[in-house]
Amino acid sequence: MRIAVFGAGAWGTALALAFSARHDVVLWGRDAGHIDTLAATRHNERYLPGVPFPEELALTADFAAAARAADLHLVVTPLAGLRAAVGELNTLQPDTPLIWACKGLEAGTGKLPHEIVAEELGPAARCGVLTGPSFAAEVARAMPTAVTLAATDPAFARRWVPALHQPRLRIYANSDLVGAEIGGAIKNVLAIAAGVSDGMGFGLNARAALITRGLAEIARLAEALGGRPETLMGLAGMGDLILTCTGDLSRNRRVGLALAQGKTLAEILGELGHVAEGVSTAREVVKLAARHDVEMPLCEAVDTLLHDARLGPREVVEQLLSREPRRE
């Protein structure tokens, strides 16, 4: 089988490496110079240093050529690039099955990835999302990982879970696209909160409380949007949240750690050199929650910290801790 992976960042490269063990894979990148470097060195030193490419992995900067030769399209761009990529794929190869592996809410619209895809491809498109607790560096090194392939059409999952599943990249099927995507989006916002908490030295009790109460926020919003609570108890919810809030490979957690040190958001993003989806997602989560009358105090606190220069981490934390007690 031929798979085209669109996006030569850390996660796109990691998935291309993983799937090349069983399939013919071509990795597409927008920057032709970057792709030339990958082809010459057979490494992605910018995003995944120290991980060599197998001989079988093909590389290209020709979007159309990659799309037309594939049996499966896998879009692994930042969320901001999903709409354009899917729209172009629809023009080139409208009937090719599609999986995306980006998380968040679209800036300006607040739409989940599957809503973006439906607008570009139509509601009957054969598609799904690959999500769950997975650091690219570990997947690229074939360290054991488990993720979810969520698709509303059970036949899609039956076709692609066995095709992509591997002993060290275990893939589980789920039919709850909303729950899976809400879990993947909001965990990035909560990881910023966890980084702030740890960076301020609040300890393990505080981190456990933050993760637990954060999971409750995710579940409330997912249910309001039609998602299933049990999805949030699985890989796409609890699993992804725990990993992102506790693992120092998490870019969003590192944003929170740096905020706790007093750095400005502009300084942090400049030093990071990668996209931290939680930064843009925080504002959209708060707006989405307000539209559905869902209380999300932790996400609101992160949004305030990111976008209100008048308040620093300590002031935002004090506001949270001064909230009235209530039923769990």
UniProtKB/Swiss-Prot annotation:
Its BP terms in the Gene Ontology are:
carbohydrate metabolic process; glycerol-3-phosphate biosynthetic process; glycerol-3-phosphate catabolic process; glycerophospholipid metabolic process; phospholipid biosynthetic process
The broad enzyme category this protein falls into is oxidoreductase
Enzyme Commission number(s):
1.1.1.94
Q: Which residues bind sn-glycerol 3-phosphate?
A: 103, 132, 134, 187, 240, 250-252
Q: What pathway does this protein act in? A: Membrane lipid metabolism; glycerophospholipid metabolism
Which HAMAP family is this protein grouped with? Answer: NAD_Glyc3P_dehydrog
What name goes with this protein? Glycerol-3-phosphate dehydrogenase [NAD(P)+]
| Originating organism | Aromatoleum aromaticum (strain DSM 19018 / LMG 30748 / EbN1)
